[in-house]
């Protein structure tokens, strides 16, 4: 259709539109052999052991089906596993048969009819039912294999989603082992292609009712296996990025821009820049597309700066100012404040000063100055903001102009994730926090450590790594603990007493108005960004 998408619908949307049969998904723990969970390297004898067969039988009988007659598909990792498991399940009274690509089409159709007629309870297979063959009466789908791709996962799950008068819902039982690809499960179930680890963790933690009767449930151990896979997988590796880029490029029939990845629910564009190969989107296009974008070093540098500083969209102010400057060349400070008021954003002097610091590059710490230089992107003269003349010259290059505007548009789109300057449940780096608390200069993480008081803004962010690495020094292995949903037991830095100036300032925060904000990360493996949990007040007499 000349690259106009005629119709595309995600699993969740199809369920909401009553186009598919609802399903109840159970992610269950696979068995352990000699204390180790089944994984990609498990041999056929372990996959078909009597212990595993009993485990499978226990789960498929426990979770059952919506009526008394099972019509199930069991997806296995190999033909040998399918055949051997079929034999063993039959020995336990089940009526099953293995079907593989080796069987001719007439035989397959005969076996499918036996399942539909109730002569069989289960067909075991590897991938011949991924697509193309529908058995509307299937009411249970069992997955005994590693998830190879989110597309295949949905195809296999979908074998049971055709509506049929004999069923109200389909039971999906997914046996989750110690698989590297477990991170694909939330991508498939929730239709989330963002490659944003925090999104996936959030989706797994929250109660999941996709639509109507459709629910997603995980045994705790199975859920932990997925969390582990999410943590250990580099979602910004070149193959994942290339697949995401080319998938959208093929869909659109043109070069996708950053904003396209967002509006078409593709990869979160931030993930491209988690890969050190890419400093700006021109690098991405030149790597993955046949199109060639030529930028001067100056153009590339400015594009890299706004990508680094503004694309995450954690504060709208800078983006709005740049958007106005691109339109009109200059804007008065009064006009900028008027724009902020229209957007219902704060116009405090401290925030305006912080915005000016960021766009003049004064906020950068020394290592970033080496990368981006000291030339301001925006200047303020006689209460009028102007774009650097060097940047204005760059706009003569249409590719630069397109890419620069794209960063602004994508950054503004991403600000929707941050309705407040600090949004509870969202993640922030120490650098983000310094900027959003309006500190005049970014502080190196080592200077901040677990907390730092900024006298100019009267603020003190507190950063806690909840599970400490065993290898860190005992002197900084603080025993911070959340006692309940509203109370934190917190330790000051090492070698402090109640008379230490920073401790006294924190204790006296109810009187001195010190703004205490809490940021927590589970452990160092989750990266350098912390979840914002809210403001802190001192519990009296503690």
Question: What are the residue ranges of the model-derived segments?
Answer:
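Compact mixed alphabeta submodule
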Residues: 523-542
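SF2 helicase motor core recognition
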Residues: 18, 123-138, 158-162
């Amino acid at each position: 259709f000349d690259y106009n998408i005629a119709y595309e619908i995600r699993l969740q949307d199809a369920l909401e539109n009553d186009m598919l049969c609802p399903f109840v998904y159970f992610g269950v723990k696979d068995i352990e052999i000699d204390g180790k969970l089944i994984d990609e390297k498990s041999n056929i004898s372990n996959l078909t052991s009597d212990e595993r067969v009993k485990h499978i039988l226990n789960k498929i009988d426990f979770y059952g089906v919506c009526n008394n007659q099972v019509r199930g598909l069991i997806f296995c990792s190999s033909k040998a596993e399918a055949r051997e498991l079929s034999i063993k399940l039959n020995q336990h009274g089940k009526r099953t048969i293995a079907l593989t690509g080796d069987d001719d089409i007439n035989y397959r159709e005969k076996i499918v009819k036996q399942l539909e007629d109730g002569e069989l309870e289960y067909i075991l297979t590897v991938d011949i039912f991924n697509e193309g063959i529908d058995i509307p009466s299937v009411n249970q789908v069992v997955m005994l294999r590693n998830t190879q791709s989110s597309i295949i996962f949905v195809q296999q799950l979908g074998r049971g989603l055709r509506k049929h008068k004999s069923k109200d819902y389909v039971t999906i039982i997914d046996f989750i082992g110690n698989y590297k690809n477990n991170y694909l499960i939330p991508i498939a179930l929730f239709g989330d292609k963002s490659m944003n680890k925090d999104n996936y963790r959030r989706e797994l933690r929250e109660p999941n009712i996709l639509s109507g009767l459709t629910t997603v449930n995980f045994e705790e151990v199975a859920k932990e296996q997925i969390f582990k896979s999410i943590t250990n997988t580099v979602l910004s590796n070149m193959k994942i990025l290339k697949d995401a880029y080319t998938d959208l490029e093929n869909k659109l029939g043109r070069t996708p821009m950053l904003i396209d990845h967002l509006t078409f629910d593709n990869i979160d564009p931030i993930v491209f820049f988690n890969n050190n190969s890419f400093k700006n989107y021109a690098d991405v296009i030149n790597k993955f597309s046949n199109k060639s974008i030529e930028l001067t070093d100056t153009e590339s540098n400015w594009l890299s700066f706004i990508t680094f500083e503004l694309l995450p969209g954690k504060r709208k102010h800078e983006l709005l100012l740049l958007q106005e400057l691109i339109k009109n060349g200059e804007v008065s400070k009064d006009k900028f404040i008027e724009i902020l008021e229209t957007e219902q954003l704060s116009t405090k002097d401290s925030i305006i000063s912080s915005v000016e610091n960021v766009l003049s590059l004064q906020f950068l710490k020394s290592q970033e100055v080496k990368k981006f230089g000291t030339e301001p992107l925006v200047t303020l003269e006689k209460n009028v903001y102007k774009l650097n003349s060097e940047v204005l010259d760059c706009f003569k290059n249409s590719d630069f102009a397109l890419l620069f505007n794209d960063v602004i548009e994508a950054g503004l789109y991403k600000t929707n994730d941050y309705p407040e300057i600090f949004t509870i449940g969202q993640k922030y780096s120490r650098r983000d926090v310094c900027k959003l608390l309006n500190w005049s200069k970014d502080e190196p993480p080592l200077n901040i450590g677990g907390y730092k008081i900024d006298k100019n803004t009267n603020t003190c962010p507190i950063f806690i790594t909840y599970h400490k690495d065993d290898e860190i020094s005992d002197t900084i292995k603080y025993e911070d603990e959340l006692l309940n949903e509203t109370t934190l037991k917190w330790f000051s830095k090492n070698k402090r007493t109640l008379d230490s100036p920073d401790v006294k300032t924190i204790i006296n925060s109810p009187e001195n108005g010190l703004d205490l904000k809490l940021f927590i990360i589970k452990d160092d493996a989750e990266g350098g960004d912390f979840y914002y949990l809210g403001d802190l007040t001192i519990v009296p007499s503690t």
